[in-house]
Amino acid sequence: MATPQISRKALASLLLLVAAAAAVSTASADDVLALTESTFEKEVGQDRAALVEFYAPWCGHCKKLAPEYEKLGASFKKAKSVLIAKVDCDEHKSVCSKYGVSGYPTIQWFPKGSLEPKKYEGQRTAEALAEYVNSEAATNVKIAAVPSSVVVLTPETFDSVVLDETKDVLVEFYAPWCGHCKHLAPIYEKLASVYKQDEGVVIANLDADKHTALAEKYGVSGFPTLKFFPKGNKAGEDYDGGRELDDFVKFINEKCGTSRDSKGQLTSEAGIVESLAPLVKEFLGAANDKRKEALSKMEEDVAKLTGPAAKYGKIYVNSAKKIMEKGSEYTKKESERLQRMLEKSISPSKADEFVIKKNILSTFSS
């Protein structure tokens, strides 16, 4: 049977959509060029126009703008006629002073070949900024929707997700009109992204304005309300901590036994099973002819472990076996090999696997 043919025009359109979605789904600070005192005039006022955000790291409005500006940068990444850039005014005061910056964030438009800026006065959303840049630069770039890592709950899905005894679930009950909810939204999205590789952790939300009965069931009377539903307490407990990303990450790590930083990277504690430390010490201190006995003790203890610790325990045992087989140099050589792999372009799941193994190996070299 003949295969249906796709027209070149349709294929081209499809490829453009895929490219746009891919660009925005991987939006990051790297998509916005960070300018300094020495690079500003090398990049701005040259052969392309530039939109520049002058910001301060401590500024709340700047933090709120950051994810929108990063989406803008990702969308315009391949637009050769436009530069999306930023300047840290705490570090580069002279640049900000030169261009009359007195508050943060200040967004200025520099036409091609000009260092005479025009101040942007519009809304601080990726869509509004894109519309402005398109009108000034005669471009036609669209902001594609960014896939969310937050699980959106409904009355039909709430119980199956939140009451799942194999998951630790954080739920935000929000209202679309709520100002505090809007402020929290980009932070909550980043939190979900941090833990997207952890199958046992779910970051979710529920439109409590739309699903009032469910919100009332869980005692929600203000927005946003955050409740944590751990594996052992599906009645839920109030989250009363801070609402910055670092606060949430600290809470999840403590409650769920995870070990991630605010960028989603595993920390040096990931994979470490404290109860096995004495057995590792005994193994390393044993004479070669006694190591088999020390390994047997380790295997016995690992067999009693449950959950993620059971998986990590097997890596401890395999590491000990490799040391017996290849000698003490194995730890150093394998750690160096894993580090080389981590420096390559690998999937997040592979990176997690290698970091955990490297962390566990480090316990055999101390």
From Swiss-Prot:
Biological-process GO terms, alphabetical: protein folding
Keyword tRNA-binding recorded = no
Positions bearing the site annotation: Contributes to redox potential value: G60, H61, G179, H180
Could you tell me which residue ranges the Thioredoxin domain spans?
30-138, 139-257
Q: Which InterPro entries match?
A: ERp29_C, ERp29_C_sf, PDI, PDI_thioredoxin-like_dom, Thioredoxin-like_sf, Thioredoxin_CS, Thioredoxin_domain
Q: Which residues form the active site?
A: C59 (nucleophile), C62 (nucleophile), C178 (nucleophile), C181 (nucleophile)
Catalysed conversion reaction:
Catalyzes the rearrangement of -S-S- bonds in proteins
Give this protein's Gene Ontology molecular function annotations.
protein disulfide isomerase activity
All disulfide bonds of the chain are C59-C62, C178-C181
Subcellular location(s): the record lists:
Secreted
* Keyword annotations of the record: Disulfide bond, Isomerase, Redox-active center, Repeat, Secreted, Signal
Question: What EC numbers are recorded for this enzyme?
Answer: 5.3.4.1
- Kindly report, in one word, the top-level EC class recorded for this enzyme: isomerase
Question: TM segments?
Answer: none
The site (Lowers pKa of C-terminal Cys of second active site) lies at R243
List, alphabetically, the PROSITE patterns matched: THIOREDOXIN_1, THIOREDOXIN_2
A GO CC annotation recorded here is: extracellular region
The record's annotation in Pfam families points to: ERp29 (PF07749), Thioredoxin (PF00085)
The organism's superkingdom is given as Eukaryota
| Positions marked as site (Lowers pKa of C-terminal Cys of first active site) | R124
Which Gene3D superfamilies does UniProt cross-reference here? Endoplasmic reticulum resident protein 29, C-terminal domain (1.20.1150.12), Glutaredoxin (3.40.30.10)
What is the protein's major site of localization?
A: secreted
Q: Which family does it belong to?
A: Belongs to the protein disulfide isomerase family.
What does the UniProt function comment say about this protein?
Acts as a protein-folding catalyst that interacts with nascent polypeptides to catalyze the formation, isomerization, and reduction or oxidation of disulfide bonds. May play a role in storage protein biogenesis.
Protein name per the record: Protein disulfide isomerase-like 2-1
Q: Which organism is it from?
A: Oryza sativa subsp. japonica (Rice)
Q: What is the lineage of its organism?
A: Eukaryota, Viridiplantae, Streptophyta, Embryophyta, Tracheophyta
Q: Which gene encodes it?
A: PDIL2-1
